[in-house]
Amino acid sequence: MAINIRKTHPLLKIMNHALVDLPAPSNISLWWNFGSLLGLCLIIQILTGLFLAMHYTADISMAFSSVVHICRDVNYGWLIRNIHANGASLFFICIYLHIARGLYYGSYLYKETWNIGVILLFLLMATAFVGYVLPWGQMSFWGATVITNLLSAFPYIGDILVQWIWGGFSVDNATLTRFFAFHFLLPFLILALTVIHLLFLHETGSNNPLGINSNADKISFHPYFSYKDLLGFFIMIFFLATLALFMPNLLGDAENFIPANPLVTPPHIKPEWYFLFAYAILRSIPNKLGGVLALLFSIFILMLVPLLHTSKQRSTIFRPMTQIFFWLLVANFLILTWIGGQPVEQPFMMVGQIASISYFALFLIIMPFAGWCENKILSLN
């Protein structure tokens, strides 16, 4: 009998267990496609970023011009840049949908996998933030100034911390150089953590829409889910191509077409759309330190979700009460995203404050209480 090399070769064996002979639940829906889509996004971002880095100059006198040079003079530079800029937006769309799937179907009960996922989200946000500074436009400069300045809210060490990150007394050449270094380094750290994320996931196996043990009904990953993922790849590449070729500046800020000028402040300083929900939470608290802590907690609250799970059932598929609150959370997230892009005036401030309170209340009080109530209703039957 012929020896199957993919099952015996030390390297191919690892790949085989992860991508070919991996036992997967037979009933996982399209919501389970986003993990592989995130992997594709990461590969696209690393490759396009590598080619951009070959032509980019991390110097405040040349950064803006080098980006213009990439778009005008480099062969298909405009395309590489548009794919990289819009690929970041698609990356965040996929990760938010991936997290929403995890919350809806109770995947967060795989605590190690979930917590590494939250760290991955934080690293992705850090990478996107430092990357947004690199073109050295008006919003790049002022975004960097405002967001890094938030660290000065920490008592005693705040001001020293800000100057240490800036590499001086203002956002200057040293800041841009180190941000470029971080932007180059962090995706590889994300790649390494993704491998660990998968390692922990394959220890337990995937969850499924019913939230029950599916060991009795598993099928091999290839060909069933590899082709299913491939369909997702084509759909995502179609959306990315449409965005990059027809509407490349749809999700950007017009202010960033103006070279950075420390003497002129833009009328509305706001980050990219994928940070707006956290930015709205930050702005809704009048105290600077309180705002910064709320901003951090708005992301790290996800780490508390496994501890706040009170229901006897894992998935929300048979829990209509929790389902309502889940969709309220989704609506709340969208409202916060909208508010984050609006000027700081009434009625936006009030709506932002109500949405911020609702955001934390849904995670910390309402959804755990709904789970407890559902347990009581079940015990009555």
From Swiss-Prot:
Binding site for heme b b566: 98, 197
CDD domains on file: cytochrome_b_C (cd00290), Cytochrome_b_N (cd00284)
Localization, UniProt: Mitochondrion inner membrane
Family annotation (Pfam families): Cytochrom_B_C, Cytochrome_B
Gene3D superfamilies xref list: Cytochrome Bc1 Complex, Chain C (1.20.810.10)
Residues that, per the record, bind heme b b562: 84, 183
Alphabetized UniProt keyword annotations: Electron transport, Heme, Iron, Membrane, Metal-binding, Mitochondrion, Mitochondrion inner membrane, Respiratory chain, Transmembrane, Transmembrane helix, Transport, Ubiquinone
InterPro entries: Cyt_b/b6_C, Cyt_b/b6_C_sf, Cyt_b/b6_N, Cytb/b6-like_sf, Cytochrome_b, Cytochrome_b_C_euk/bac, Cytochrome_b_N_euk/bac, Di-haem_cyt_TM
Residues binding a ubiquinone: 202
GO biological process: mitochondrial electron transport, ubiquinol to cytochrome c
Cofactor(s), by name: heme b
PROSITE patterns: CYTB_CTER, CYTB_NTER
Metal-binding recorded as keyword: yes
Single GO molecular function: metal ion binding
Cofactor note: Binds 2 heme b groups non-covalently.
Ranges that cross the membrane: 34-54, 78-99, 114-134, 179-199, 227-247, 289-309, 321-341, 348-368
Membrane topology (UniProt): Multi-pass membrane protein
Annotated S-S bridges: none
GO cellular component, one term: mitochondrial inner membrane
Family per similarity comment: Belongs to the cytochrome b family.
Subunit structure: The cytochrome bc1 complex contains 3 respiratory subunits (MT-CYB, CYC1 and UQCRFS1), 2 core proteins (UQCRC1 and UQCRC2) and probably 6 low-molecular weight proteins.
Other facts noted in the record for this chain: Heme 1 (or BL or b562) is low-potential and absorbs at about 562 nm, and heme 2 (or BH or b566) is high-potential and absorbs at about 566 nm.
Its job: Component of the ubiquinol-cytochrome c reductase complex (complex III or cytochrome b-c1 complex) that is part of the mitochondrial respiratory chain. The b-c1 complex mediates electron transfer from ubiquinol to cytochrome c. Contributes to the generation of a proton gradient across the mitochondrial membrane that is then used for ATP synthesis.
Protein name: Cytochrome b
Protein species of origin: Prionace glauca (Blue shark)
